[in-house]
């Protein structure tokens, strides 16, 4: 600071400093101020950084006047130490005490002005030309220096402070600090108003005004911030003054409609304007402004490189003027690289767009072109681009436009020509454009012919491609090799994805795939699509790196895809957002992350994930060291935070910590990857190897004594194969251990250690050279200080200690960081090599073992055939059949259990299946999954629907399921094969007759009549039966033995759940005292020699089935059981009947039916088959079928068909009576007498059959069921059948006699039903009233029969049949 004048007292100086506390006082001079012409008064001149102050010579000091340096218009130095200052408010003339004081004031003002308005030369004009100017110091630290090269950010802070002082506003120090620190550290030349959006509009205006005098910043940026009028005025002022501002971005800044017109005028004023990038998007602009701007752009000598006018409401007229400007100014053809006219509807729909098309058709330098949402005609545009933009265009966005205005079916030629000729395209966006099928084909054909492009991103989302587009993609996409990223979201593919996904997998150049919003299908189809997708990403040569199924609403079935991510090695990024997979999906994702080592990025949100789901992810990331990025799930986190804030915050912090840890170089756990691959490679084929080795060993032992040389050679080869198979178990760990041992001291580590040593020496040498160079330069610039420092011995010794780099740091950087990354990659490659070698060897061993097994089995068969003795056809045939059966069993077991063809593809398929995590219980328990699983086992869909849809348990026998047909069933009623009484009415013409299923087996061969006869008479029914899977009570809820939940049981209670089965009501005599009382049947007579004990039917042949069939389920009257299936019956076993006794309780379960077994007393060719169906050719068979069809057609009639009137309400049994009947069942059973009748054969054999109770329910229950038939539903009575010899129907009235007669009839009588004319000849008919002891075939009831009263049935049984056919038939 200049020395103050001697006249100024100390007190006055301190008072002036206190008055100017806001700014530091740099100089104080005692001057003579000219107040009037030639009249001078004493004043004090105080100089601060940006202002000159005049004080009176009084204490306390008071400012008389002041002015800012920016107010100075002229500063003249006159003779006699006088200066004349011209300001905006007037002239100021003062006389200083000395020439030195004049020089100090002059330098101060010049320095301040140079900081605010930097420029060359002196800003002070000398009034006396004879007086030479003194020497000017131009050093960087001099006060008169005008150089701003070394100032921070071009002196923005000083300019801003001067402008604040000039406008009388407070200077924001935070603005100065941000610019001097942050902008300077980043070397950022873009001034972003968003960084100071928290300040007032006046502060923003001053900052923008400071840019007018600043040469550092070249870009002014403002987006999504509404600017006031003050700021916009300063923007225009800055553009009119600045010579360094090159780019202006005012995107959605709230510009007025006349701003562009003012901007055009500013461009005309500033001849030195260097602006070359202009962005005015999302601001309304009027046509007048566009016209003015177009006129000014004609004068731009260098044109514009970037012009963004998106969503500016530009009219076609303004576009026409703009296009003409582009064509008139030749600079635009070489300078314009970025053009954005998007979001202006109707802009290119008129003829005014031809001016723009003309510019685009000329050779130009466009790189980025965005015309989305402008209603442009794509084929016309591509025709223009074909001539002018093929060589430079990289980004093309034509979304939300129309393809062509023509309605022809021919593809526009421009599609194929342009996309086959483009050289540098990397992004093509055609989303929300309804592409015709031919246009899509032309597009794909053009890309397939283009050999210049690679890694092209093609966006075809929301194009409504649907099935036709999917078909075109399947046909054409395989030949397209330049597309690296394909977006097919929201195209309505749906079920077409079943064929499209495999087609996408054939394109090996595809790296990124987007398939969201295409899964609007049913659950079963959705699972099939997801399995196809899983199969795609599990292929060994899969090229996909990222997969997106965002916003597909997959819900819980997202886990099907997630389960395949665990062992996946190709995907690095996956997007699962918007699928609503909930916490279960998060848990499945956590399990996948625990073993995955390839995923780097996961995007997931909008999945209804709570804090518990995030906790599962956090725990999984503790063992995952490869995931680098996980998007912040805003929706799910906010929802979880509302319910559990503390837990959500802790869990997310843990997730972020794991991600930060994974972004640093570290050792990856290779042991985990080793164990995973070992399980996938070895476990997939180990069981198959064991089976094949066991089979081959058995064959080797059987053929070891064969003297044939070829056989011995094959035996030797087979032994070698078995040895290789045993050694292959240790192949994988041995190879991995070998690679691990060699890698510890391998050449890579040795080379890294040597490089670390060499780098340490090079670092020391470089530091030595740098130190010597710096010291020499310091000695040159400051020689005196260097001599003093060397004299004190401080310089070189202190610096040498600071420039040393520890060798441990270099070794750690190379070996622990870079070396560890190299080692991790090396371990991955090593593991892949081990996996490949092991898989190849195991595949070869399996293939050779399989061929050896086939060859040895063939030799064994030939030897057994030759060993049969001649002349013994029976024995030889038996031996041959045994040999064939054994060999056939070997071969069939191998083909079925080990795969129909043991080749490399089969092994790969099994390994791929093992890589995928099995479906969880919450998905597999669904009906859709059950149907699909049963379909894979050969069971038609819906087979278990009658049993409640429960899953089968593992305890049940599933052996019979393999014998069921694997093809689908036609939709037929479950009870269509139920026995029907003969009908004479012809069937309806609409339904074909179905053959009786009991006459043929499933393979189409005729059933043998004596099939299973020996087993039938040698096995027990209940206790000793091993193939009967379960009792009836365990079968009823489903095939599962677990009890049903209460809710499900409650739902199964129908309106008629309290009804008992009709078999319980049919045995009561006509004079029963209690309505609904059910008495048990008497036990059958003791067995005779002609009728041995009956065996267990399920063990007979291949026709037995351990499960309930639909026919068996439907054999009861609907409405009397409360639900489908035999749920009302009691358990079998000791509760219903004793093991040694024959008569089981009426609640005994209905056994599975046996096909093809002819019992004594019932000729197989003439009677009923044991599955309850008629068999045998003849007119009666056809008539029965026709009658049944007509009955079914009448039953299925619509609401308008005739129905019988229900019985009166008084005749219906009460619920309490039925409950009492059930409670007294066992008492009535014990009190029933035993009836023994010596009836001749075959009646005795039929009676013997009753010993086993409900072995064949369709033969024991008709007597009871017949009484429940509604008279209105039986048009004619069945034909009477002869009463067996030695048996008379009971005629005595009374309760006891009627009860005994009703109970004895089912237990003893086995009537011969009249089925054909041949049977009629053998058994003459006996005409007469129906016998209560006789039974007829059960009729399929209608649901209205449930109302039939038990009291009503008793007199009806004794009533003779009505010749009109309206009375109820008897019990036959």
From Swiss-Prot:
Residues 1040-1073 are annotated as: Necessary for localization at the cell membrane. Its main location: cytoplasm. Coiled coil: none annotated. Residues 1233-1244 have a biased composition (Polar residues). The keyword Cytoplasm applies. GO terms for biological process: cell migration; regulation of Arp2/3 complex-mediated actin nucleation; regulation of postsynapse assembly. GO terms for cellular component: cytoplasm; glutamatergic synapse; lamellipodium; plasma membrane; postsynapse. Residues 1163-1177, 1219-1229, 1348-1361 have a biased composition (Basic and acidic residues). The keyword Ribonucleoprotein does not apply. LRR repeats lie at residues 244-264, 274-295, 303-323, 335-357, 365-385, 392-413, 424-444, 455-475, 482-501, 509-530. InterPro entries: CARMIL_C, CARMIL_PH, Leu-rich_rpt, LRR_dom_sf, PH-like_dom_sf, PP1-Reg/Actin-Interact_Protein. Residues 126-151, 865-900, 970-1003, 1024-1372 are annotated as: Disordered. Residues 1048-1063 have a biased composition (Basic residues). PANTHER family: CAPPING PROTEIN, ARP2_3 AND MYOSIN-I LINKER PROTEIN 3, LEUCINE-RICH REPEAT, ISOFORM F-RELATED. Belongs to the CARMIL family. This is Capping protein, Arp2/3 and myosin-I linker protein 3. It comes from Homo sapiens (Human). The gene is CARMIL3.
């Amino acid at each position: 600071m200049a020395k103050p004048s001697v006249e100024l007292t100390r007190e006055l100086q301190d008072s002036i400093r206190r008055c100017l506390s806001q700014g530091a006082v740099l100089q104080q001079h005692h001057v003579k101020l000219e107040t009037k012409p030639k009249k001078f008064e004493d004043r004090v001149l105080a100089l601060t950084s940006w202002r000159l102050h005049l004080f009176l010579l009084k204490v306390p000091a008071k400012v008389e006047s002041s002015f800012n340096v920016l107010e100075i218009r002229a500063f003249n130095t006159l003779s006699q130490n006088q200066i004349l200052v011209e300001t905006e408010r007037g002239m100021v003339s003062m006389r200083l005490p000395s020439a030195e004081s004049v020089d100090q004031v002059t330098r101060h003002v010049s320095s301040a002005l140079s900081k605010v308005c930097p420029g060359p030369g002196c800003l002070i004009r000398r009034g006396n030309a004879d007086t030479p100017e003194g020497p000017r110091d131009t050093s960087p630290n001099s006060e008169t220096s005008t150089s701003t090269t070394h100032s921070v950010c071009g002196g923005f802070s000083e300019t801003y402070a001067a402008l604040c002082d000039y406008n009388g506003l407070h200077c924001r120090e935070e603005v100065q600090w941000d610019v001097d620190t942050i902008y300077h550290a980043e070397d950022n030349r873009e001034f972003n108003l968003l960084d100071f959006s928290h300040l007032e509009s006046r502060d923003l205006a001053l900052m923008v005004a400071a840019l007018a005098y600043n040469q550092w910043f070249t870009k002014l940026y403002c987006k999504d911030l509404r600017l006031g009028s003050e700021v916009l005025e300063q923007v225009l002022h800055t553009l009119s003054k600045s010579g360094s501002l090159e780019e202006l971005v005012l995107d959605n800044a709230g510009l007025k409609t006349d701003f562009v017109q003012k901007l055009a005028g500013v461009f005309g004023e500033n001849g030195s304007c260097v602006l070359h990038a202009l962005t005015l998007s999302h601001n309304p602009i009027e046509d007048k402004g566009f016209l003015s701007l177009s006129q000014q752009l004609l004068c731009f000598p260098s044109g514009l490189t970037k012009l963004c006018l998106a969503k500016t409401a530009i009219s076609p007229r303004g576009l026409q003027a703009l296009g003409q400007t582009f064509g008139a100014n030749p600079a635009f053809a070489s300078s314009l690289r970025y053009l954005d006219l998007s979001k202006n509807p109707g802009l290119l729909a008129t003829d005014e767009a031809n001016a723009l098309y003309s510019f685009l058709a000329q050779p130009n330098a466009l790189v980025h072109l965005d015309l989305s949402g402008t209603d442009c005609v794509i084929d016309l545009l591509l025709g223009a681009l074909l001539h002018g933009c093929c060589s430079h265009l990289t980004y093309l966005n034509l979304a939300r436009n129309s393809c062509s205005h023509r309605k022809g079916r021919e593809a526009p030629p421009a599609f194929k020509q342009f996309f086959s000729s483009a050289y540098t395209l990397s992004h093509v966006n055609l989303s929300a454009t309804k592409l015709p099928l031919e246009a899509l084909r032309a597009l794909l054909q053009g890309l397939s012919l283009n050999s210049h492009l690679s890694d092209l991103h093609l966006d075809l989302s929301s194009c409504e491609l649907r099935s036709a587009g999917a078909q075109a993609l399947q046909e054409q996409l395989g030949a397209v090799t330049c597309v690296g990223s394909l977006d097919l979201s929201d195209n309505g593919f749906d079920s077409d994805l079943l064929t499209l996904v495999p087609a996408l997998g054939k394109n090996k150049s595809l790296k990124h795939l987007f398939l969201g919003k295409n899964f609007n299908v049913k659950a079963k189809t959705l699972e099939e699509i997801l399995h196809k997708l899983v199969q795609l990403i599990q292929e060994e040569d899969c090229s996909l790196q990222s997969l997106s199924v965002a916003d597909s609403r997959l819900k819980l079935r997202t886990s099907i895809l997630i389960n395949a991510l665990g062992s996946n090695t190709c995907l690095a990024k996956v997007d699962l957002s918007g699928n609503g997979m909930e916490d279960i999906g998060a848990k499945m994702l956590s399990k996948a992350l625990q073993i995955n080592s390839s995923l780097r990025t996961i995007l997931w949100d909008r999945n209804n994930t709570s804090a518990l789901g995030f906790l599962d992810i956090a725990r999984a990331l503790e063992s995952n060291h490869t995931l680098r990025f996980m998007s912040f799930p805003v929706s799910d986190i906010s929802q979880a935070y509302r319910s559990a804030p503390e837990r959500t915050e802790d869990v997310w912090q843990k997730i972020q910590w794991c991600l930060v840890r994974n972004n640093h170089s570290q050792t990856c756990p290779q042991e985990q990857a080793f164990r995973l691959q070992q399980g996938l490679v070895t476990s997939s084929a180990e069981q198959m190897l064991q089976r094949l080795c066991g089979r081959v060993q058995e064959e080797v032992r059987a053929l070891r004594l064969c003297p044939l040389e070829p056989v011995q050679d094959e035996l030797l080869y087979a032994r070698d194969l078995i040895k290789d198979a045993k050694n292959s178990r240790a192949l994988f760990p041995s190879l991995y251990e070998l690679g691990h041992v060699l890698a510890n001291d391998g050449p890579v580590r040795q080379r890294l250690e040597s490089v670390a040593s060499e780098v340490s020496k090079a670092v020391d040498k470089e530091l030595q050279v740098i130190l010597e160079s710096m010291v020499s330069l310091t000695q040159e610039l400051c020689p005196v200080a260097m001599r003093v420092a060397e004299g004190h011995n401080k310089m070189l010794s202190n610096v040498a200690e600071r420039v040393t780099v520890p060798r441990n740091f270099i070794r750690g950087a190379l070996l622990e960081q870079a070396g560890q990354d190299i080692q991790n990659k090396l371990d991955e490659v090593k593991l892949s090599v081990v996996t490949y070698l092991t898989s190849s060897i195991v595949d070869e061993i399996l293939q050779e073992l399989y061929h050896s097994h086939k060859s040895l089995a063939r030799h064994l068969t030939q030897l057994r055939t030759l060993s049969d003795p001649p002349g013994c056809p029976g024995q030889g045939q038996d031996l041959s059949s045994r040999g064939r059966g054994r060999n056939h069993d070997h071969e069939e077991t191998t083909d079925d259990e080990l795969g129909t063809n043991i080749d490399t593809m089969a092994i790969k398929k099994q390994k791929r299946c093992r890589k995928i995590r099995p479906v969880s219980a919450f998905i597999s328990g669904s009906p859709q999954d059950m149907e699909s699983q049963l379909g894979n086992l050969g069971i038609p869909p819906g087979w278990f629907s009658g049993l409640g849809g429960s899953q089968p348990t593992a305890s049940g026998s599933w052996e019979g399921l393999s014998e069921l047909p694997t093809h689908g069933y036609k939709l037929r009623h479950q009870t269509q094969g139920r026995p029907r009484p003969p009908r004479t009415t012809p069937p309806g013409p609409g339904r074909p007759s179905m053959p009786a299923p009991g006459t043929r087996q499933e393979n189409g061969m005729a059933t043998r009549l004596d099939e299973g006869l020996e087993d039938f008479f040698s096995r027990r029914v209940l206790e000793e039966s091993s193939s009967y899977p379960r009792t009836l009570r365990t079968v009823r809820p489903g095939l599962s033995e677990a009890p049903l939940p209460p809710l499900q049981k409650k739902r199964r209670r129908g309106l008629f759940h309290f009804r008992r089965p009709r078999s319980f009501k049919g045995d009561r005599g006509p004079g029963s005292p209690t309505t609904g009382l059910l008495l048990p049947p008497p036990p059958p007579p003791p067995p005779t020699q002609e009728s041995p004990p009956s065996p267990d039917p399920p063990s007979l042949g291949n026709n037995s089935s351990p499960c309930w069939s639909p026919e068996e389920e439907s054999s009861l009257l609907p409405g009397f059981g409360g639900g489908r299936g035999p749920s009302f019956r009691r358990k079998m076993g000791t509760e219903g009947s004793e093991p040694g006794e024959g008569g089981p309780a009426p609640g005994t379960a209905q056994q599975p039916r046996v096909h093809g077994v002819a019992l004594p007393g019932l000729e197989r060719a003439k009677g009923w088959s044991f599955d309850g169906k008629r068999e045998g050719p003849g007119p009666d068979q056809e008539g029965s079928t026709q009658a049944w069809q007509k009955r079914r057609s009448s039953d299925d009639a619509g609401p308008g068909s005739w129905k019988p009137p229900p019985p009166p309400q008084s005749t219906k049994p009460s619920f309490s009576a039925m409950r009492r009947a059930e409670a007294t069942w066992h008492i009535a059973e014990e009190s029933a007498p035993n009836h023994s009748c010596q009836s001749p054969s075959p009646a005795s054999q039929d009676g013997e059959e009753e010993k086993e109770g409900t072995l064949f329910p369709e033969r024991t229950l008709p007597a009871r069921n017949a009484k429940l038939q509604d008279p209105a539903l039986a048009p004619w009575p069945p034909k009477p059948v002869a009463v067996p010899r030695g048996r008379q129907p009971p005629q005595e009235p009374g309760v006891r006699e009627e009860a005994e007669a009703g109970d004895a009839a089912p237990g003893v009588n086995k009537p011969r039903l009249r089925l054909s004319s041949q049977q009629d000849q053998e058994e003459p008919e006996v005409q007469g009233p129906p016998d209560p002891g006789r039974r007829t075939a059960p009729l399929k009831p209608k649901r209205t029969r449930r109302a039939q009263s038990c009291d009503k049935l008793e007199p009806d049984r004794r009533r003779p049949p009505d010749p009109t056919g309206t009375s109820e038939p008897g019990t036959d």
